[in-house]
């Protein structure tokens, strides 16, 4: 009995000595993974440098996919001179105050800025797609990860034109992002496609089957592995909805539900694509045209609550920016100076809440631009630890 106990102690000592000599952590790697998943994205990126095993964990596709299942956030950006300011706020209801509790938040979360040239083109040409955003600076196409603050400059597509419309898609089956681009100055039956993360960053030519051109200000919308954008088909002299299956790289043409829809506003409504009608319905509401199965459309009317709560909150001063995954409509001030207002409206509960951003800009920028700044909003943004290095 004593000999068995002695052997057990010797084996325990040998295991401990082995761990000590190897210098490895005594924390099991699966527990390390659980701990890292509970940390903010900034901390995850920082702990990547602790050791090779930790770096391996945070760059594994499985770990990266788990990060995207966290509660989505509202990503906020604006450009002032050569500085590009970035912040984000949670979307879940517990964070905000209702209308009958007048309250303003004055501190932003993780505000930082990046330097860009004055030649930075219209922003943003794409939405946030599984944590990544693509935009254009001068003649360069750039993929941006707001979580890691990394930028990836893509090779220039063939052709001399800089007049490009850019789309970003994500295939949830294979876990791949793809960048699409086409010229908007003329009609074409081809599109250029590049797969991120491939060994060779090469643009491929994909046939669209229908000669069309997209609108420069159309950022498209990627939903369940399909990128949608509104396009003009010259041969038919009609505006249509084009779909691009990210995995199969096949285009399809879908008839629009009405000729009177906003051509620059596409929305993810409960996991389905929706267009916003231009017509004014009863009580200043909005009409959504929702794409159903077999490319059929249904319509749904929503009350626009702003003018009913406060007459000074005209819908002309606020823009519809989409829906949260919880079904709330997001309104954002079209222009702001030192503070910006964001409103959330739940049409089912008939409740509203607001978030006021104070101190978003420095005094020097407020004084230098009397017309104000445009706040770019990315609903349902998820964290991503995809690395470009």
UniProtKB/Swiss-Prot annotation:
Positions of region (Disordered): 1-26
SMART domains per the UniProt record, alphabetical: FBOX
Pfam family, one: F-box
UniProt biased composition (Basic residues): 9-21
InterPro entries in the cross-refs: F-box-assoc_dom_typ3 (IPR013187), F-box-assoc_interact_dom (IPR017451), F-box-like_dom_sf (IPR036047), F-box_dom (IPR001810)
F-box domain location: 21-66
Ranges annotated as spanning the membrane: none
NCBIfam families linked: F_box_assoc_1
Name used for this protein in its record: Putative F-box protein At3g10240
